[in-house]
Structure formats: C-alpha cells, structure tokens
C-alpha cells in the first residue's frame, strides 16, 4: 500500500505543474468511473480546459485519468453561469487483486458545468461528465476489449 501511495504522489507531482503552467488552476474531488479521487483542472484559454484525477480503484488498486474539454455552449439560469463541454479522456487502473490486473479506458465525453461564487471571493465549479468509450481489461486469461461508459460528478475550487 505504501508503494501505491508513493506512485500516486509521484504522478500528481509530475502532472500538476505541467498542467498548471497556463491559465486558471483548480483542485477538488471527483467521484466516478474510471477514477475517484483528487482532481486537478486547468483552463488553457476561454474555450479549452484540461483535467487529471488520481485516486484509488474500486477493485483495490490505484488509478489515474487525463482529459481535455472544449466549451461549446454557455448559458445563464437566473444569475448562475452554466456551460456545456465536449472532449475526451483516457484512464488507467492498476489492481492489487487476483482477478483483474489492470484496465485502460478511452472515451469521448460531454459535461455540464455550473460555475458559482461564495461571498464574491471563492470560485467553484460543479460538473457532471458522461460518455461512451472502450475498455481494455487485462486478466490472467488475456486482454478483454469491450464497450465501456465513463461518468463523474465533481467539485473544484479555483485558486
């Protein structure tokens, strides 16, 4: 377990500074598939953002995903800002059990994002990301390829 935490920390230490080079940067949490854990989000410009999530896999292992989204629509409901994005992501999971050794998922995705501010000081985004994809499951019997589906609900704080 200590090795898994060290690997996870190294992934975060390498990925975050590279992603945070441009634009606004956010950190938060994400619950979903293929990854549940700490998420980092970075805006590259007004239309394009990237994200990375690292955490623990449901099957007993570690996981990480990276992706990018392009903003295609923006609208308001009352004073609240919402926007719709399309993009893609890829995730990898390494298991520490007998049945599944590892899994890789690649997916097209869309998301609905809600930006809000608390007391005109703190900027947050809540998002729901869903999409179809393909999964590669590595077991003792070989590689199984099949349809997959990604989904996540998250909250990030921009700093």
Map each language-model feature to its residues:
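Extracytoplasmic loops and strand-loop junctions of Gram-negative outer membrane beta-barrel proteins
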Residues: 21, 136-137
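Cleavable N-terminal export/targeting peptides
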Residues: 1-24
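Solvent-exposed loop/turn segments connecting transmembrane beta-strands
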Residues: 25-39, 54-64, 96-103, 138-148
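Outer-membrane beta-barrel "beta-signal"
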Residues: 66-68, 146-159
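Short, hydrophobic/aromatic-rich segments at coil-to-beta transitions
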Residues: 21-28, 46-51
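C-terminal binding/interaction regions
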Residues: 129-131
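Gram-negative (and chloroplast) outer-membrane scaffold detector with strong preference
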Residues: 42-126
């Amino acid at each position: 377990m200590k090795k898994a935490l060290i690997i996870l920390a190294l992934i975060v230490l390498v990925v975050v500074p590279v992603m945070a080079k441009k634009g606004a940067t956010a950190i938060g949490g994400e619950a979903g598939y293929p990854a549940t854990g700490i998420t980092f989000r970075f805006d590259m410009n007004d239309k394009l953002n990237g994200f990375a999530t690292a955490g623990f896999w449901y099957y007993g292992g570690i996981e990480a995903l990276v992706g990018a989204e392009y903003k295609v629509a923006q609208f308001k409901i009352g004073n609240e800002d919402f926007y719709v994005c399309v993009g893609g992501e890829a995730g990898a999971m390494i298991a520490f059990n007998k049945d599944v050794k590892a899994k890789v998922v690649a997916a097209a995705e869309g998301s609905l994002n809600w930006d809000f501010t608390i007391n005109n000081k703190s900027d947050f985004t809540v998002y729901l990301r869903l999409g179809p994809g393909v999964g590669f499951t590595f077991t003792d019997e070989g590689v199984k390829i099949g349809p997959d589906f990604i989904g996540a609900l998250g909250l990030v704080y921009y700093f």
